[in-house]
UniProtKB/Swiss-Prot annotation:
The active site is at 75, 119. The lineage of its organism: Eukaryota, Metazoa, Chordata, Craniata, Vertebrata. It is found in: Secreted. Disulfide bonds join 38-98, 54-144, 56-72, 71-125, 78-118, 87-111, 105-116. This is Basic phospholipase A2 cPt10. Belongs to the phospholipase A2 family. Group I subfamily. D49 sub-subfamily. It comes from Laticauda semifasciata. InterPro entries: PLipase_A2, PLipase_A2_Asp_AS, PLipase_A2_dom, PLipase_A2_dom_sf, PLipase_A2_His_AS. PLA2 catalyzes the calcium-dependent hydrolysis of the 2-acyl groups in 3-sn-phosphoglycerides.
Amino acid sequence: MYPAHLLVLLAVCVSLLGASAIPPLPLNLVQFTYLIQCANKGSRASYHYADYGCYCGAGGSGTPVDELDRCCKIHDDCYGEAEKMGCYPKLTMYNYYCGTEGPYCNTKTDCQRYVCACDLQAAKCFARSPYNNKNYNIDTSKRCK
C-alpha cells in the first residue's frame, strides 16, 4: 500500500471517531412540524415558533412572555416528564394523522403515546394562541430572567 493511501485511511478513521461523539439530531422534529401545520391549517409556518419568546426553541428560562410562549413551556415540561418515564422525546417517532378535525395520534407504545400527546397539545395550543411579532427573536438575556 502506498503511503498516501495510508494517510487517507488514517484521516477517514480519525474523522469517524470524531463523528461518533456528535449527538443525534431530534428525529421527531419533522413530525412535530407537521402536527403544527395541521393544527393551524397552514396559517403560519412552523419555523416561526423556533425562536419565539423565552421557551419556544432551544432551552428556556424565566417567565413566558405570553400565551404562545406558555404553550412552549408546557411542551418543554411535558418532554421533561417523558424523560422521567424513561422516554427520549426528541428521538421518539410516532404515528399521527391530519384529519378534517385536525391532527391526532395513533401510536402503540407508552412512550410514543406520551410524546405524541405532548406534541399534539403544543400544536393545538399554538393554533389557538395569538402570535405577537414583537416576541419573535427577542433578547432572552434581558427578557427571560
